[in-house]
Every structure is written in C-alpha cells, then in structure tokens.
Amino acid sequence: MLQSDINELVNQAKRVITPLSPISTFAARNPWEGLEDASFDQVARWLKSVRDVDIYPNASTIHRAISNKEIDLKVFEERLDENRAHYNNRSLSDSDINTYIQRAKNLKTIEEGYFNTKDNEKLEKWVQTNFKDYKKKEDVIAQSASVFTKEGTRLIDILNAHMIKWSKLYVDDFQSSWTMPKREKGFYHAWQRLVKHDPLFTKKQRLTLAHLPNQATEAIEYAFQELGVKEEHRQSYIESHLLSLPGWAGIMYHRSQTQSNDAYLLTDYVAIRLSIEMVLLNDHHTTLLKKSIYLQKKLEQIRYLLFNIQMNVEQWLNLSSKKQQAYIELGTRFSPFYFKKLWLDAWEETHERRLVDEIYRVPTEDTDQAKAKVQLAFCIDVRSEPFRRHLESEGPFETIGIAGFFGLPIQKEVLDEQFAHPSLPVMVEPAYRIKEYADQHEMKIYNQQQHTLTSMFYNFKLMKNNVLPSLLLPELSGPFLSIATIANTIFPKKAKRIVHRFSQKWLRKPTGKLTIQREQDAYSKLPIGFTLEEQIQFSKKALQLMDLTDDFAPLIVLCGHGSESHNNPYHASLECGACGGASSGFNAKLLAVMCNQENVRRGLLMEGIDIPRHTVFIAAEHQTSVDELEYIYVPPLTTEAQNAFDELKHVMPKVCYKANLERLASLPNINNTDHNPNAEAHRHASDWSEVRPEWGLARNAEFIIGKRQITQNSNLEGRAFLHNYDWTKDEDGEILNTIISGPALVAQWINLQYYASTVAPHYYGSGSKTTQTVTSGVGVMQGNASDLMYGLPWQSVMMNDKEAYHAPIRLLIVIQAPDAYIQRLLKHHNHFRQKVDHQWIRLASIDENNSWKDW
C-alpha cells in the first residue's frame, strides 16, 4: 500500500476512539462520537464482541434502580409483552418460552457450582463439534488478544505494558526532568533509536526491531505482511489495537489535531504497536497458546441458556438437534443484551413520564417579564437549575438559560495564566483572540512578584528531581511542609484563608481590561478583538439566544460559572463544559462590556433591539461548589440598576443557604448542614483530602429548549440543562439550529461521558481518585502502568462501592416548538437526525397547544 493509503487507513480507524485533551483542560467527550452512524445497540454488541466491554447498565445497577422506583415495572412488562407477542417458535411450547423469559429477564448470573468440571468439558466438546466453521465467524481483532503464554498471560497485555512505557515517555508535558531523546524527530523515529537498547526484549527481538523500516507507514505495511492481515481486514485490525489502550491512543489523536509537528502521531503509534506485536508473536523462546474467542462466547451462551431453562448438561445432549437449535434461537432472540436494552428503555421512559407529570403539574402561564427588576442569564449547566429556582422564589427576578460561552468564539489570554485557552465548545475552533491587560506599572510589579514565586517552585522541583540535592531537600523543607500539611488537613478553611490573604497582599492581580476593539498583531494567528460590526452582531446573537430582545430589566447579570476545589486533578471537569473545561466568567464579562457600549447599543437599535438607557449589564461567576455569585464586572450603575442590585444582594444569602442545603443533602458523609450549609460547603471545597467536592453534572438527564415558564414551577432536581428559546421569534429556525449544533451537542457529550463512566468504569472511567497517579502532566493512570484513564473518576458517579449516584440514561432533548419546526430541523440537520434515529439521544417536543410528543 502507498504511504498515503496507510495514513488514510489510520485516519478511518480512529473513529473508534476520541481525542483526549490534557487533564488540565479536561472537557467532556462522547466516547462513541465516531460510531454514531450505527445504532446504540449495534455499537454495544460490537464493543462487547471485540473488546468485552458492556455499555448497557449491569444487573446490579438495574436492580438498584428498580428498588429506588426509578424504573416502573409496568413500563418494562408492557414493552416485553409487546415483543413477546411477535415472537413465534414452533419447536418450543409457550411454557418453555415463558420459563426462559421469566428467568432471563432478571439478568441473574450463573450460580456457582451449577456446572461442574465435567459439565464444562462436555459442553466445550459439544460447542467445538457444532461450530466447526468458527474461524469464518471470528471478529477481526489483534492476534495477540487471543494468544496466551504458558503462564496464562495474554500476549496483548505484554504488548500494552510496552506501549504504556513508551507512550508516557513521549507525551510527557515537561513533568520529567529528562525528556525522551530524539522526541523532536517524532514518536516512531525516537522509539526506533531507543528500543534496540530495551532489556525487556530478547537479543533477537531487539535485532529485528533495529532493522525495521525507517518510515512508520512502511513499518505498518511490513507488519501487516508478517502478521498475514488481509487487506480487507486492515482497518478493523488497527481499530482493535486502538481500542486496546483508548486513553493513550486518544492523547495521540488529540496531539495529532493540535500540534502540526505531530500530524501523523497516531500513525507512529500504530506502527510501534504492530511492530512490537509482530516480534512478540514470532518469539520462538516462549510457548504460545491460541484460544478461539468466538468458541468461548458460544460456550458462555449455551451455559447461560441452560441455566435459564433449568436444564442440566445430560438433558441438553439428549435433545434432538432441531430442539437444541430452537433453544439457541430463543436464547439469541431474548439474549442478555435484549433484556438490558429493554431495561434501559423502560428506565428512560419512566423518567420521561415523571418529567411530563412534573412539568404539567402546575398550569403554564406567561408571566409579565417587564415586572422583573433583575434578569440573570446562567449557563445551561444542570447545577444552575436549583440556584435559579431558589433565586426566582425570593423576589422579582427572572432567570435565563444560555450556553456559558455566550456565543463568543474566542480564545482567551488571561493575565495570570501562562497559556491562552479556547473559551468555547471543544468541537468549535476559536475565531478571535481576546487578551486581558492592565496598567503597565502594576503589571511590572505583579510579574516580578510572580517570577519570584515561580522561581522558588522551579528550584524546589529541580532539587527534588536531581540525585544529590534531593537528599538534602527533606532537611530543608521538612518543617515548612509539615506545618502546611497539618494546617491543610486539620484546618482546611483557615489554611485556605491564609493563602488567600497572602495572595491578596503579595500577589494581588491588577484589575484587568479586555481588548474588545480590534488590534493589529503580526504574530497572532487569530485576529485580536472585534470590529464594531462584529461586536454588534455577536451581542445581537447572544441576546437572541437568551430570548432577551425586549422587556429589559434595569439590571442584567450575565453569569458564567466555575468551581472551587483543592488538590483536585479533575478540577477542569467541574468547570464550564461550554468553555472547554474553563470558567466562563471571562466570556460573561466580555459580553457585558460590549452590551454597555453606546456605539454597540446604537447598532443593536438599528437591528431592532432597543436597550433602555437605564439598563446596565454586569458580569458574575456562579461558584458551583459553594453556590455563591461572585461579581467580576460592575460598571457605574444607574439609579434604577443600583436599586435592583441592592435588592439582589439582599436576598442572595438566603438563596445561597437554600441552594447549599439542597445540594449538600445529596453528598455522602456530610455533617448536618441545617444550621450553616454555607460554612459546610466552603469547608468541603477547601479540604484537600476531599475526593468529592461536588457532584458536578451527575444525574443529568434532559435538555429543555423553550420558555422558562414551562419549567418555572417545576423542581427538576438539578438534572436539567435549561436553554431559553421562543419559537415565535425564530421563523427560519436558525436560532434552534444553533442551539442544537452547539449547546445541545455539548450536553450530549457530557451526558454520554457520565453514562460511559458509570456503566463501564474500568474502561471508560478513571477509577478511584485515591489510587490515581498524575502521569506525564497530561492525565492519570491507576498505579504506574495502566491505560491513560480518560473518563470521570469513581467518586464523580458512584455513591458508594455498590450504588451508582448517576443514573445512566441517554439525554432527552425537549423542544418547545410546533411540529413543523421539529420536522424542518430533522430534515436539514442530518447529524442530529442520525443521533435521534440511532438512539444516541431521545427527542420530544411541546407544541403550540402545549401537547407533548415523542419523536
């Protein structure tokens, strides 16, 4: 094959993994985004077949949901009866069929001792006799996955250990003092130069590896020929290898997208994997045993069938071939996969029915928005729903939902951050750069102070990572670090307060301004700032997305959000998902400043949006771990705006109290918070030993697009993404299309990230925080040699060892609009329609007559 063909092959195969950004900029990803051209059920069966990963909720999760009344058994039985009515098997009686179904539907595992050793031997022999053509039906997987050493170790596990070692050396983000030699030449080139010295390979293996082709594409072609992989199976073969370590493959994928010198990094990764697999399989010094994975699966299928029809092995062997085949057909039709799918569908339908009941519990009435003294725009994040609900109950306050990046496609450059950060959804590239700047004299002092502090930390790290100085370091730093450790452990709030006071006194960040106006910079790849017309259009678009084009209150608060936590590698996962894993206060401030400018308001007036002179925009940040509003931009206020602001600040302590009381009640191991939930929330966020500072977006379940009035009187339990939308102001459907293409997609990615981390935590999660190791500065491993764990930690989705807190159900999108709007959306938005048709998301609508409809 040509070099371009090999690169294209890898490019096509990467559909099975997702790009993994460094943990410092963690953003939720849909693990199956590249597989959505197939249905959810098809992907589930395929993953179970090729990787033994089950992405349906397991039996214990389902039984727990039933006991918690989250699954209505009537809904499940209705669906089961409907499917059973269409099934006919003439070789089996209804009694036989019903006996199997009634047992199999409960997903019980085979009881220990049900089959003895002789039973298993007889069944294994029967399977081998009756499935002689198994080789034609084997899935295309890495050959090393079905080969074992004489000690019982899978060869692919040995291969993975090699890949983990080399991968973490290459992707190291300056965490190590010594970096991988020749890294600047590329992964394959650097590996090829070093692997010939690797003592874990035999002398013969090192010799083979030393004489591999110099180009990664040539090495892949050579390995394919040596391994005997047919051309039509090559993409599937590469996919199998990428799925073996999806975390390390994912970080390679991300780097190939973001760093021009690593554009073919994934090709290098595949070349190294195939080359190592080739030499391991050709090792004549090790006895290798090959097992048929297909026959193993068939054996398990027959065992499960016999267990559920209550038949022993002798009875099975005495059945006629026709009767055996009939039972196998029954077991295939009503397999564990079938029942898991049915249970998940019933769980989702139960939740939807209860959501409908809650929304329609109180009649929807349009309120007079002009009566609101303050309008507050919050991110759609589910954590804002309880806060908004409590805020609205305390006075004339209207809350609005919009994605936290406020429709601004920017890369932000903040004063106290080393690197620029895209502040928009990860699937969108930034189009502009906005810089924060301050007075030159103040910045000079601030930079000097910051340089002094960073120099101290740099020298500390330098001493720690060098042999001789590291022996002296404990003597020098021990007393100070001991005091800091004791303070952070016993008095976390006080320790944090001391650090904060120190920062305020010695590292006080100057008040920053933003480069809103267009500036010229020959070295910037992105235009800095906006032209006046761009400011007008972005402001207009944001106001339209908020459904805020008339009836303005005297004070409008644009609320970004962030999260406070201490000693938390996953801090970015608690930030704004719509801003790519960063706090969204920057975007809120930028939009507020633009909307206050006279020339922008004049331009908006020409566009039909008349903002009263007494109306003022301010910016705040909702701290989700303590449920407080931090005001980050408050310009001079008009009398009307000041009165409204005073009223807002007056009720805020009560709102924070109620929001924290509700939120902390769901966290395990929390002290009684009735007296002072705010203090408990701050203690929780300050505690560096706390593995669960907040639940994040756990239990997210629906995305509701419509007027606030349809949910204003409902308690949605912090499970709903809420986005304002008025279909009467969107005749061409452009606003709805924008919401579906951006915020709804982000919500789906978040939903499936939580889903995957709950149903398959060993593969899509990242294990317990207490045993994680931050690796190469880019992610975490369990111990010192695992896959790069790219999902959410156990503490983000589990209540305890046995009970999941997150409910693994797929996102329900509810749109308040006439049927014609939904039909138009599905017709023109192919990507969204595919998600609905293939059951990656669920879709419902509330029409102009307030009627609910499932699509």
UniProtKB/Swiss-Prot annotation:
Keywords: Cell membrane, Membrane, Metal-binding, Transport, Zinc. The keyword Membrane applies. It is a peripheral membrane protein. Coiled coil: none annotated. One of its GO terms (cellular component) is plasma membrane. GO terms for molecular function: zinc ion binding. It is found in: Cell membrane. Part of an energy-coupled inorganic carbon pump. This is Probable inorganic carbon transporter subunit DabA. It comes from Staphylococcus epidermidis (strain ATCC 35984 / DSM 28319 / BCRC 17069 / CCUG 31568 / BM 3577 / RP62A). The gene is dabA.
